[in-house]
Design a protein with these regions (language model features):
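Short, acidic/small-residue loops that bind anionic groups at enzyme active sites
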Residues: 91-103
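Conserved beta-strand segments of the P-loop GTPase G domain that flank and frequently precede/overlap
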Residues: 10, 70-74, 104-105
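Short acidic, S/G/P-rich loop/turn micro-motifs used as interaction or catalytic elements
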Residues: 14-18, 75-78, 109-111
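Conserved N-terminal substructure of TIR/SEFIR domains
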Residues: 1-67, 95-97, 155, 159, ...
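Short, glycine/charged-enriched secondary-structure capping and boundary segments
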Residues: 22-25, 83-86, 116-119
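Conserved TIR/SEFIR loop-to-helix hotspot centered on a Trp-containing motif
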Residues: 75-91
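Acidic, Ser/Thr-rich peripheral helices and adjacent loops at domain boundaries
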Residues: 114-151
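Short beta-alpha junction loops
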Residues: 101-117
Length: 185
């Protein structure tokens, strides 16, 4: 089997677009395809039931994705669309099997969270659903790397993990964007 996977990249569009561009340029050839995060404000009615929202994202935006990558910048954890994309990508549906999941800490994460030692992270400053899945052994988190072989290895491991570990999708979905320095349960 090839180690080239179709990946979906979830990121904070307003703050981390430049990193998404760098990521796509640097690593695009290592993957079968990169699908950038594309659920925008107004695309999905937030008043729909949670299951309907997740199903729409899974079937309309994340079709045929092998692995979801979350680019984690300074305020990524606050975004409802990122929460929805993570929750939808780890759902196993008739039309689409669940995706593997991993997070990559961007340089902007450590620039903003100066008290967090490089190579580490504060669990309350990454997307809560991603953290739940790191704890469950379904997801992993890594520091930004410029080495395509390293990143491709992370993606392949996430792809393999999706069959050997169960995701945790028990957290209530964000109803709106959050604010503050960190999340609380």
């Amino acid at each position: 089997m090839s180690n080239r996977h179709k990946v979906f990249v979830s990121y904070h569009h307003a703050l981390d677009e430049s990193y998404m561009r760098i990521f796509a340029l640097r690593f695009g050839n290592a993957f079968r395809a990169i699908v950038p995060g594309s659920v925008q404000v107004g695309d999905i009615d937030p008043n729909l039931p949670t299951e309907t929202i997740r199903q729409k994202i899974r079937d309309e935006y994340l079709r045929d994705i092998s692995v979801t990558i979350v680019l984690i910048g300074a305020l990524t954890w606050q975004r409802k669309h990122i929460d929805w994309e993570i929750g939808s990508s780890i759902r196993d549906t008739k039309a689409n099997p669940r995706s593997g999941l991993l997070g990559i800490l961007l340089p902007s994460y450590h620039a903003h969270h100066v008290r967090v030692e490089r190579g580490r992270y504060n669990p309350r400053t990454i997307p809560p659903r991603l953290y739940d899945n790191i704890k469950a052994g379904f997801a992993s988190i890594h520091n930004w790397s410029e080495d395509p072989a390293t990143v491709q290895g992370w993606i392949h491991q996430a792809y393999l993990r999706k069959s050997s570990a169960l995701p945790d999708n028990s957290r209530a979905s964000f109803g709106k964007n959050r604010s503050g320095d960190e999340w609380n349960d």
